[in-house]
Amino acid sequence: MPMSLGNAFIKNFLGKAPDWYKVAIISFLIINPIVFFFVDPFVAGWLLVVEFIFTLAMALKCYPLQPGGLLAIEAIAIGMTSPEQVKHELVANIEVLLLLVFMVAGIYFMKQLLLFIFTKILLGIRSKAILSLAFCFAAAFLSAFLDALTVIAVVISVAVGFYSIYHKVASGKGVSSDHDHTQDDHLAELTREDLENYRAFLRSLLMHAGVGTALGGVTTMVGEPQNLIIADQASWLFGEFLIRMAPVTLPVFVCGLLTCFAVEKLKVFGYGAELPDNVRHILVEFDKEERKARTNQDVAKLWIQGLIAVWLIVGLALHLAAVGLIGLSVIILATAFTGVIEEHSLGKAFEEALPFTALLAVFFSIVAVIIDQELFKPVIDAVLAVEDKGTQLAMFYVANGLLSMVSDNVFVGTVYINEVKTALVEGIITRDQFDLLAVAINTGTNLPSVATPNGQAAFLFLLTSALAPLIRLSYGKMVIMALPYTIVLALVGLFGIVFLLEPMTAWFYDAGWIAHHVGEATHAVSGGH
C-alpha cells in the first residue's frame, strides 16, 4: 500500500532518526515559544541550551546540525537573539571557522607523511601503556604550539588510515584496492572479534590524544582560542603567559600523564584494550608493502610534506598569520608540489570539516542567545560578590569549570575575562588580583571542560567526525572515558589555584621572571567578545 503524503512528510523529517527522537525535537519546537512568551525568557534560554546539549548527546542518532539548527532558527525567529548578534559572534570567532575550513583540509594532504610516522610509532612501541603515554604526550606537546583542533584533525586522519587498512584486508581485499570501510558485511565472525578489540584500542588512543590536547592547550597562549583572548586582555606575551600558568598547569600535566598510565594498566573506564595480533600482523605487512612499492616520486612527496610540516609548526608557534590562513598555505603548497591539481581531488579534503563548520555556526547562534538573555549573569555576579580573595579565586575556577562543561569554553572564558576586566576598570579589584583571576579563568575553562564533548571544540569535532561511528565512540562513551581525567584534572587544578598560585606568583615576582602590571591594560571587549 503506497504511503500517504502526510506520512511521507513525517518519514522525510530527520530521515532515519528514530521516531521518539523526531517527536522530542518537534515538542522542543512547540514548547520553546510558549515558555519564552508566557513563562520567562531566562527559563526559555536555559531550556534551549539543555535541548542543544541533547542534540549533541544524540549525535550518533542524527547529526546535530539539523535538529540544533531548527532550534536555533526558531530562537532567532521568536526574538531570543538577533541575526546581528549571531553575525557578531561569527565575526568574533572567524579564526576558529577559518581554521576548520582550511587547516583540517590542509592536514588531509599531509596524510601520507602522518601515516608513515604514526605507523612507525604504533608498530615500534609494544606496550599499550607506553604507547598511550606517547600519544597523550605528543598531543599535549603539539597542542602547546598548534591549535587543539589541528592536532585532533591529525590524529583522526591517522586513525581513519589505520582503520581502513585493517578493514580492507579483513574484508578479503588487497591493501591497495579501493574499499568502503564503513560497511561490515564482508567480515567473517573471527575477524569481527578482532575488529571490536581494534575499535576499543583506537577509541582509547583517541581519547588519550584528546585529553592530551587539553593538557598542552592550557599551558600557552596559542594553545586554545580563549587563551589568546585572555592574554590579550591581560597584555601578556608568550613567555609571561607560560610562567603565570605554570603553578597550575605543571602539576596538572604530570598528574594527567600519570592518569593516562594508570587507566591503561588498571584497564578501567573502557581503557586497556591491546592491539590484536592479527591486526598488528596486517599493519606490519602493510608497512612492508608500502616500503617495497615506494617510488622516488613517493619519497619526494614525503620530503615535501615534511618541509610543509616544519613550516606549519613554525608559522603557528610564531603566529605569522591566522591559523586558517596558514592552513590555506598548507593546502596550496602540498597540492602544488605533490601534483594534486584536479578540482574533485581537492573537494574530498573539505568533506570532513565543513559539516562541523556549519554546526559550529549554529553553536554560535546558541551562544548569542546566552549573551542576549544573560543566562550566565547570576553565576558571574555571585562569584564577583565574594569578598575573600583566595575564595574568589577558587570560586572562579569552579564556576568556570561548571559552565565550560555545558557551554563552549571559548565563550565562557571570554565572558568571564570581560566581566573581570570591567571590575578592574571600575576599581572593584586590584591589578594583581586581576592577573591571578585571569589564571583561574584560563585553567577553569580549559581543564574541567574535558568532562563533556560540548566543553572542548576538539572533543566535539571528534564526536561528530566520520571516525566516531566507525569505532563506536558515542557521547556517553566519551563522557565515561573522560571521567578519570575530569576528576584528576579538575581537582589537581583546584589544588594548584588554592595552594600554589599565590605563593608561586609572589616567588616569580621576587625572582624577576615576571613584573607587576600597572593600570588596566586594554579596555574590555565589546558585547560578548
UniProtKB/Swiss-Prot annotation:
Reaction catalyzed: 2 Na(+)(in) + 3 H(+)(out) = 2 Na(+)(out) + 3 H(+)(in)
Membrane-spanning segments: 13-33, 34-54, 90-110, 113-133, 136-156, 205-225, 241-261, 306-326, 327-347, 351-371, 451-471, 479-499
Annotated localization: Cell inner membrane
Alphabetized UniProt keyword annotations: Antiport, Cell inner membrane, Cell membrane, Ion transport, Membrane, Sodium, Sodium transport, Transmembrane, Transmembrane helix, Transport
Gene Ontology molecular-function annotations: sodium:proton antiporter activity
SS bond list: none
Single GO cellular component term: plasma membrane
UniProt xrefs under InterPro entries: Na+/H+_antiporter_NhaB
Highest rank taxon of the organism: Bacteria
Annotated membrane topology: Multi-pass membrane protein
Family of this protein: Belongs to the NhaB Na(+)/H(+) (TC 2.A.34) antiporter family.
Protein purpose: Na(+)/H(+) antiporter that extrudes sodium in exchange for external protons.
Name listed for the protein in its UniProt record: Na(+)/H(+) antiporter NhaB
Species of origin: Vibrio vulnificus (strain CMCP6)
Record gene name: nhaB
